[in-house]
Amino acid sequence: MQEYIHVKGAREHNLKNIDIKIPRDKLVVFTGLSGSGKSSLAFDTIYAEGQRRYVESLSSYARQFLGQMDKPDVDYIDGLSPAISIDQKTTSQNPRSTVGTVTEIYDYMRLLWARIGTPHCPKCGKEIHQQTIDQIIDRLMALEEKTRVQLLAPVIRGKKGEHVKVFENARKQGYVRMRVDGEIHDLSEEFKLAKTKKHNIEIVVDRVVIRPDARGRITDSVETASALSGGLVIADVIGGEPITFSQNYACDDCGISIEELTPRMFSFNNPYGACPVCTGLGIQKRVDPDRVIPNRHLSIKQGAIRASGWGNADTGSIAAMYYNALGKKHGFTLETPIEEFSEQALDELLYGTGDEPLELSVSRISGGVMRQPFEGIIPNLERRYRETNSEWSRGEIEEVMSESPCPACHGRRLRPEVLAVTLGGLNIAEFAEKSVVKAMEFLHTLKLTEMQHKIGDRVIKEIMDRLGFLQSVGLEYLTLSRSSGTLSGGESQRIRLATQIGSSLMGVLYILDEPSIGLHQRDNDKLLATLGRLRDLGNTLIVVEHDEDTMFAADHIVDIGPGAGRNGGEVVFEGTIDELLKSDKSITGQYLSGKKFIPVPEIRRKGNGKSITVKGCAVNNLKHTDFTIPLGTLTCVTGVSGSGKSSFVNEILYKKLAAELNGAKTRAGAHDEFIGIENLDKVIDIDQSPIGRTPRSNPATYTGVFNDIRDLFAKTADAKARGYNASRFSFNVKGGRCEACAGDGLLKIEMHFLPDVYVPCDVCKGRRYNKETLEVRYKGKNIYEVLDMTVDEACEFFANVPKIARRLETMREVGLGYVKLGQSSTTLSGGEAQRAKLATELSKRSTGKTIYILDEPTTGLHVADVHRLVDVLQKLVDAGNTVVVIEHNLDVIKTADYILDLGPEGGDGGGRLVVSGTPEEVAQCKGSYTGQYLGPILARKNGGKRDK
């Protein structure tokens, strides 16, 4: 086997004909500045070629489902293994996807509960056992005399197919009727079932009338039905509810029977297991009273009621007619604040008067009074939501709805009879609600009978192994019931990493994108040990990473640079960590060796004397915790993964401020009191979401500098002579753009079974504008050539235009100098998008009363980029604003004015404020994991070699 993966002539994106040998079966780190070409080499070249070769080895039939993969721009790659990419894309936004289902642990749980679980009656809780034929007969004979009953044998339950043989066998046995999907069919008829749909088929064994002398006949029919179906009998009571009997399990006291336990009954994605009310989602969208009336200080006349169709309180409106009638009954007017309504008045306003009529004044119609019950605002909205076919109407009503746990299953997703099956005293949903650590403890101490051991030991081992893999990547705080859509990119990636460890493959090439993101320094060792295990199995790991611990643990390091964009794309350094520390060419090496460093501020800001205090925070695992943030400071919220940082900052702090200051329709998580909002005028969340979702959006349009550039072109002598205004230089409207491609510069060719192909427009040659518009020039450049400039080039080009130069300089300050002005927003990384947002904010006039919130802004950033980011954040604070950052990166934490450290652990063991204060104060706290790692960094102060 070859010792190296040899990449020759890699030219994808900004790569400059790279020729490199990567050692196999080693942990290899690719590092370098953001935008230098690391991902282009790792993902777009090496992984893409590995995947393409694998797909090409499949049959043409299989390839049509996987899509055509383009060959990356590379001469050749030797020594390539099958490649698996583990990136930071969140696992799934499907509300049915959970940590348990993604890791396949839930599949083993379903098998375990189905095979060795103990069923109970969902009504009385008593253990239930199999029913005998005599017990079934006694239950039927207890029905009221002369009751007509149809006895059915369910032979097919929820299975796809045409089931021709089932019908043939029934005919041969002399049966004349069958119930198919709820409808009775005569077997003499010819009918065909849809092959791709699931069906329920029951043989009609007998139709009987309950009488004392019919016992013998009923007994024969029940025995026959039971034999046909394998123990199940359905008694379809005419004019009543059908009764299912089982020779497997039934409650003597309540007369409730359940089927024999099968794994599919424990799946919330299967109709046989899912709660019938919420269909297995665990949540329901319901109209929220607090959204219908968000401000109870207002009166109806002042617009207190924000619901669709109920906001108009003008005289003569239908809504006002009901409001006046209710007011007459309860003694309020339309000018009375809602908070002064009696409890009954508010209840009837929201939920209606039931059958009790109101006296409605309808003088404008008939000159009299009409008596009619009031449906209530909430029932009215929910009825309209169910009945309407209009997407617009549904959207209007959804604005006052919120998700709440299903009232039937209380968020547990399953049917009552399934939730009544226990193992060790827990049902499957209660077990899924435990954290990984607690679940392992439960299984470790689970007491089973000898028979249960024989059946369940192998299944329990599989579950324990997978839980152990999750623990090994620092995810011990997650619960198996947690929705996949709520996981961060880093958590999703580590779940996939844990799944790969479980597969125990060898000879594979794994390519990972910053697996340390979202991970506290304390948990880094676990992650590195996990990566080491994958390597020791005989795999090659290529890790795109900026984390210094990972670099020190690597067998081989490749530094791509020296700059970003067109200034990058070269191999600056490759070798061991010791060689990197001595390298003068590598910026990474200079920071790791301490020659370059992010300085610790000499003075910590005390703030402007004002603060925000949030009391009694109780979202997720927060333990009614109080937090205070001094305004006019850079505040870092720290703590181990799962300690409650995002719960406080994103769910309470941001959502409350957005609702109060920005008028957003967000609803803050549970808390008791929020003090100090009056000290702020707006809140801005600067996240890593894309700055635009279409190719038309670019950094120039997002930051607003393109408006100024278009104005400048419109003022040129040539433009004035032709009568062109600023809109002529827009590629979004007709006039100056190329109409053949509608200003995109590209044409989409639909290939049907293959991916769509984009080709440059043959009219404008990809330049987006028509010929006449491109003839207008400023300083020798037309509008397309300006958009094709990098920010650095544009800074020099527009140096004499202060308005444009100021915005461009801000973009350069945040590290976007290498990005082209017209580069499509869809091609920007999350870190680049975030810096574009920061540049936009920096270029605005500051009020000094803005609070900026950032969640792990160092994601995807090299230490040199982090240095630049810290400078930008400090500038925002210097302007009088407040910056709150959730962060694990010690280089950012050490520059903060104030720290809120949550923990001490993740999950149930977190949710408390361990310590708050300056970095120096936090470093002295022995109970703080953050403090333990921060101490040595502060002691090193400015520069000095990192201890390792």
Task: Give the label of every model feature segment.
Residues 1-948:
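Conserved phosphate-binding elements of NTP-dependent enzyme cores
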